């Protein structure tokens, strides 16, 4: 199994480590590759788009010609996990809490509306206990950093977890979006969920 992690910025190392832990837990042999150019997506079985600055990731991906390739792979059904900024890039509809509608390069394949910087400056980063029972996990502590929020799902997209009535995790077919950082949490359940999807 080959898992590609988009590696322009954001917590690539942490995702790689968490993916390795998840593979070990599931007793699956796998390679983790850094995705920086279209060729790096060759033969990947799953894709992770980490957090970071979503506009930067989108612009760089577009410049290097990988955005269209990513979109094609994702639309063809490759299991994909987008975390924080990665969730923004997957979304069809993006608004910024401060400046309103935002024009930025997106993959835009997932039927979700996302508000960037939802929690505002006061809650730049925080930890919370969330319920991951929908994907076989339990209650677990996770980290939010300048987190967005998923404010609406439609079509085939459905919420998987909420925090105070706000959607923090959603899924549509092969795509999973989280507004928190699972790679900075103690549980590997989200990475395991992605690997299991890729194994089907």
Swiss-Prot record:
PROSITE patterns: PDXT_SNO_1 (PS01236), PDXT_SNO_2 (PS51130). One of its GO terms (biological process) is pyridoxal phosphate biosynthetic process. Pathway: Cofactor biosynthesis; pyridoxal 5'-phosphate biosynthesis. Its EC number is 4.3.3.6, 3.5.1.2. The keyword Hydrolase applies. One of its GO terms (cellular component) is cytosol. The keyword Manganese does not apply. It comes from the Archaea. HAMAP family: PdxT. In the presence of PdxS, forms a dodecamer of heterodimers. Only shows activity in the heterodimer. Catalyzes the hydrolysis of glutamine to glutamate and ammonia as part of the biosynthesis of pyridoxal 5'-phosphate. The resulting ammonia molecule is channeled to the active site of PdxS. This is Pyridoxal 5'-phosphate synthase subunit PdxT.
